[in-house]
Amino acid sequence: MADTLRSNFDISDGTTAIELSTVADSTTTYQTILSISLCNTSTSVDHTFDIYIKDVDGGHDGGGANTLYYLYITQSLPALSTFIHNDKIMMQDNEELYMVLDSNSSPVNSVHIITSYLEQT
């Protein structure tokens, strides 16, 4: 089994869901999310956000295909502040990690997101 450290850099795009990480195929067995950092660069606009894992094929108990499992709902992100999630999250084949910004998303590019993870093949 090989382990590779990776990171994604994203900038908010209004209320469109941003895919932070995905385990889409059988070449990657697992991903361990190490940290998610969200920085609100706006000087005056507060935001809230949701972070969830989408179970694409419905392989988990209790949900069907495309069920959303929330880690955060309406989490506060004040102007000029940073939110850091640094608890590990295990993801398997056909799981996707998303972040969605609130409808108060003007300016739309004010939240910068960095996701660090360990890819295990």
Model-flagged regions — what are they?
Residues M1-Q31, T41, D55-G58, Q92-N94, ...:
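C-terminal interaction-tip segments
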Residues S7-N8, T22, Y72-S76, N86-K88:
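Beta-strand-rich interaction surfaces with strong enrichment in secreted/lumenal proteins
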Residues D13-I18, S76-T82:
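Solvent-exposed, conformationally flexible loop/turn segments
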Residues E19, T48-D50, T74-S76:
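Ser/Thr- (and often Asn-) enriched beta-sheet segments in non-cytosolic proteins
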Residues L34, F49, E95:
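Residue-level detector of short, conserved catalytic/binding motifs and their immediate flanks
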Residues S35-C39:
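Short edge beta-strand/loop segments characteristic of extracellular beta-sandwich folds
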Residues T43-L71:
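Short, surface-exposed beta-strand/strand-loop-strand elements in extracellular ectodomains
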Residues L80-N94:
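Beta-sandwich interaction modules
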